[in-house]
A protein has these predicted regions:
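Residue-level signal for secondary-structure boundary sites
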Residues: 25, 69-71, 107
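Short, solvent-exposed alpha-helical surface patches in well-structured domains
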Residues: 26-29, 74
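An amphipathic, aromatic/His-enriched active-site/gating alpha helix that lines ligand/cofactor pockets
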Residues: 6, 36-45, 64-101
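Alpha-helical structural elements of signaling/regulatory helical domains
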Residues: 22-23, 53, 81
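Glycine-rich beta-strand-turn "strand-cap" elements at beta-sheet edges
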Residues: 1-11, 48-57, 84-117
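Short, surface-exposed ligand-recognition loops at beta-strand->loop->(often short) alpha-helix junctions
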Residues: 18-27
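Short, well-ordered beta-strand segments in beta-rich or mixed alpha/beta enzyme
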Residues: 11-18, 48-77
Length: 117
């Protein structure tokens, strides 16, 4: 049963990609273009990139979308602009990519301070 605090629309997508840390510069160069394109999508309300402090080759992308998981899988993930990014970066992956979907809690559970930027 869903929590009463989870919003009825919108999701948070957490993508984890693991590469050899020696490929970090090449990976980020290939990722930059797709990051800009995805972040510009009107349904993408938030996009932040993280790198593990314990494992430098582990990257986490957190994307918030105004749509649901079905839309994300059927519409967003099928866009042609992902193909060059996958072709360029997948050979760098040393583990399979992980994609996890989360329901977003209502606004009472959201805080973003100016210092976060």
């Amino acid at each position: 049963m869903a929590s009463p605090h989870v919003r009825s629309s919108g999701i948070s997508v957490h993508v984890t990609i693991t590469i050899d840390p020696a490929n970090t510069s090449a990976f980020l160069a290939a990722f930059r273009r797709i990051y800009d394109i995805v972040a510009a999508e009107p349904e993408c309300t938030y996009f932040e990139v993280f790198q593990s402090l314990e494992e430098p080759g582990v990257f986490r992308f957190v994307e918030n979308w105004s749509k649901d998981v079905q839309w994300f899988k059927e519409v967003q993930l099928t866009k042609a602009y992902y193909t060059p990014y996958i072709e360029a970066t997948e050979p760098m992956w040393i583990k399979p990519r992980s994609i996890k979907y989360f329901g977003r809690f209502s606004g009472e559970w959201l805080t973003v301070k100016p210092e976060n930027n």
